[in-house]
Amino acid sequence: MTTYWERLASRLPAGGSAALVTSPHNRRYLTGFPSSDGCVLILPDAAYFLTDFRYIEAARRQIRSMECLCYQRLTDTLRELTEKHGVRRLLVEAGQMTLRERRKLRETLSGDVEDGDELDDWLEALRLIKSPDELRRIREAQALTAYGFEKILDYIRPGRTEREIALELEFLIRRQGA
């Protein structure tokens, strides 16, 4: 099965291109791992999840599709990896880095750092096409929602607060596996 990062890597232009994904929602999409810190470096033939000491152990347990590395200084780790893999062009998500972060990245890396909409467009296109597993999970979530709605209708009565109804609904769907 092709992983999400491999689908993204297949869009990279030949000749030393890589992508750096930093937004929390796209990091989670590519890795399946929720965290408030980290980034994903996508190369044509490899991918790395880079994070700090707070998340590295959990990341290594949960992320199987790419290598997880702990950094002390992100720019140093990125420089080492981009040099090792011969990266001459690094695409970053538009609007995800401060000007200072982008400037520091450009000063640290030997190749070009590009922050146009190209990477954002690729990520959006990948997320639009659902995998069989994503479709299965969407169907399961929809079935749980329908079940909860059907059952909660019997519980709703005058005098019940929204909070009571919300708690009962949560209990109903959690009992079913949500």
Label each region the model flagged.
Residues 22-24, 51-53, 72, 92-97:
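Structural motif
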Residues 58-65:
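A short, polar/proline- and glycine-enriched secondary-structure boundary/capping micro-motif
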Residues 67-69:
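A short acidic, glycine-rich active-site loop
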Residues 73-178:
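Flexible, acidic/His-enriched mid-domain "rim/lid" segments that flank
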